[in-house]
């Protein structure tokens, strides 16, 4: 395990060149198979998707019984199907996303106002922090019709600490996960810290949910809000769903942590790539100007008319998938794949990062070239296996429709209204390191100065 280094996805990619796209390795006592090609990924996630629909459960995920309630970790069964159905048909349906669009537009205006203020003061912006606040507010507006955080506030830092606390504990390697004999001793304190962070976040979410339930009881004739919380309260009352309040609070935790951490990380990578490539930045700005005209905040309906912006987001996802190994899967029974037996209980990791950097799939794989997606009809929605940052099959990320809108609209708002320069020009080295965790982010935060365009 120690030989994998701090960037296991890169180490696995190098090993796959020697041992092939389907290779096995022992991580402690945990037998693991690494998948590094689109063909093998399709076998695992599509052809044998039911066999590999299980999850290996990290010790941290046992906090507050999250593993027994979370849609992300529940086995495929009645409860999982009910939550999946709510996400697909109601929470993230096209109509639901359209209904909540104006709520998100208000939060984009707040980002614009904050960036304008920084521009007038001549101060740089920590893009990760600004993206985190905006993403969290976009999600809060969509989920709860409320604002969770504000720019430059103490409450924001506290909320950020909780979210990043949960994400870091879930994402950081824990020896007790690979040597089960250590679990009762919790040598790294992972379970103890996870209980604290999970408990704090679940407490906040339960408060929002219970407040809405009580409001609905006290005001049965009040008009419903265009947010996901109304959908969840309706689901609790519906006889065709067998869900309890805790199912919905843990679902919201998954959406908050998964959505905010991955979207924040990806926005930072997108802005880094554009600032480092002035000619690409100029192309995006020109396209946005031609479509948006005098509008300051992009409307989500404009997205189909912004192919180069879409290509930029895809190219960033190819180079920097936020979860490079996706969430681990587990074989629920013995299965032969490509002539190799994968025994029941095997952990399976899909190396999305390796596929995005494979020279047999991509020309100049390490270069930021959005133009490649103008000529190829490839998308990241789970059917093109060379580009699967959100996963694929029955375990594909349920929040992808919202994340897709967030990535495009935040990027458009920042790029259309401002020119950008590095706060410290000497900090233009893209290889200063990354931090591996729930999402792989830059080790050195991107700080850039907005200049009124």
Swiss-Prot record:
Pathway: Secondary metabolite biosynthesis; terpenoid biosynthesis
Domain of life assignment: Eukaryota
Entry keywords, A to Z: Heme, Iron, Membrane, Metal-binding, Monooxygenase, Oxidoreductase, Transmembrane, Transmembrane helix
Keyword Transmembrane helix: yes
Transmembrane feature ranges: 15-35
Cofactor: heme
Subcellular location, principal: membrane
Lineage, highest ranks first: Eukaryota, Viridiplantae, Streptophyta, Embryophyta, Tracheophyta
Its job: Monooxygenase involved in the biosynthesis of labdane-related diterpenes natural products. Catalyzes the oxidation of abietatriene to produce ferruginol. Ferruginol is an intermediate in the biosynthesis of carnosate, a potent antioxidant. May also convert miltiradiene into 11-oxomiltiradiene.
Residues that hold heme according to the record: 397
Any GO BP annotation: diterpenoid biosynthetic process
PROSITE patterns: CYTOCHROME_P450
Signal peptide as annotated in the record: none
UniProt-annotated location(s): Membrane
InterPro entries cross-referenced by the UniProt entry: Cyt_P450, Cyt_P450_CS, Cyt_P450_E_grp-I, Cyt_P450_sf
Molecular function terms, GO-annotated: heme binding; iron ion binding; oxidoreductase activity, acting on paired donors, with incorporation or reduction of molecular oxygen, reduced flavin or flavoprotein as one donor, and incorporation of one atom of oxygen
Tissue note: Expressed in leaf glandular trichomes.
The name this protein goes by in its record: Ferruginol synthase
The keyword 4Fe-4S is assigned to this record: no
EC nos: 1.14.14.175, 1.14.14.-, 1.14.14.60
Protein family: Belongs to the cytochrome P450 family.
Catalytic activities: abieta-8,11,13-triene + reduced [NADPH--hemoprotein reductase] + O2 = ferruginol + oxidized [NADPH--hemoprotein reductase] + H2O + H(+); ferruginol + reduced [NADPH--hemoprotein reductase] + O2 = 11-hydroxyferruginol + oxidized [NADPH--hemoprotein reductase] + H2O + H(+); miltiradiene + 2 reduced [NADPH--hemoprotein reductase] + 2 O2 = 11-oxomiltiradiene + 2 oxidized [NADPH--hemoprotein reductase] + 3 H2O + 2 H(+)
Topology in the lipid bilayer: Single-pass membrane protein
One Gene Ontology cellular component annotation held by this UniProt entry: membrane
Enzyme kind, highest EC tier: oxidoreductase
């Amino acid at each position: 395990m120690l030989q994998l280094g701090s960037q296991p996805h890169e180490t696995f990619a190098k090993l796959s060149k020697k041992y092939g796209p389907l290779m096995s390795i022992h991580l402690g006592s945990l037998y693991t198979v690494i998948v590094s090609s689109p063909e093998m990924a399709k076998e695992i996630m599509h052809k044998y998707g039911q066999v590999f629909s299980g999850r290996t459960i990290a010790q941290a995920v046992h906090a507050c019984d999250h593993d027994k309630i979370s849609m992300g970790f529940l086995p495929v069964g009645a409860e999982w199907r009910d939550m999946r159905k709510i996400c697909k048909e109601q929470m993230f349906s096209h109509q639901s996303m359209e209904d909540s669009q104006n709520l998100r537009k208000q939060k984009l205006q707040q980002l614009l106002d904050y960036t304008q203020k920084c521009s007038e003061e001549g101060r740089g912006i920590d893009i990760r922090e600004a993206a985190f606040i905006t993403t969290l507010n976009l999600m809060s507006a969509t989920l709860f019709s409320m604002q969770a955080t504000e720019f430059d506030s103490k409450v924001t830092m506290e909320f950020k600490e909780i979210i990043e606390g949960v994400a870091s504990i879930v994402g950081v390697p824990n020896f007790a996960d690979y040597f089960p004999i250590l679990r009762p001793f919790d040598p790294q304190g992972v379970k103890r810290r996870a209980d604290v962070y999970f408990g704090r976040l679940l407490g906040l979410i339960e408060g929002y949910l219970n407040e809405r339930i009580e409001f609905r009881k006290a005001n049965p004739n009040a008009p419903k809000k265009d947010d996901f919380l109304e959908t969840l309260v309706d689901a609790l009352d519906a006889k065709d769903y067998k869900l309890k309040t805790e199912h919905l609070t843990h679902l919201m935790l998954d959406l908050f942590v998964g959505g905010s951490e991955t979207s924040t990380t990806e926005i930072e990578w997108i802005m880094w790539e554009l600032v480092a490539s002035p000619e690409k930045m100029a192309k995006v700005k020109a396209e946005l100007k031609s479509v948006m005209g005098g509008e300051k905040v992009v409307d989500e309906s404009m997205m189909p008319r912004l192919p180069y912006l879409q290509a930029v987001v895809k190219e960033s996802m190819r180079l920097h998938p936020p979860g490079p190994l996706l969430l681990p899967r587990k074989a629920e029974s013995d299965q032969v794949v490509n002539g190799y037996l994968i025994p029941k209980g095997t952990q399976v990791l899909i190396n999305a990062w390796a596929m995005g950097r494979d020279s047999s799939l991509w020309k100049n794989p390490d270069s930021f070239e959005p133009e490649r997606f103008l000529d190829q009809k490839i998308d990241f929605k789970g059917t093109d296996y060379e580009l699967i940052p959100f996963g694929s099959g029955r375990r594909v990320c349920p929040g992808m429709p919202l994340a897709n809108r967030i990535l495009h609209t935040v990027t458009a708002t920042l790029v259309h209204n401002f020119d950008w320069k590095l706060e410290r020009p000497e900090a233009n080295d893209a290889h200063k390191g990354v931090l591996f965790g729930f999402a792989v982010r830059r080790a050195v935060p991107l700080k850039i100065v907005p200049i009124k365009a």
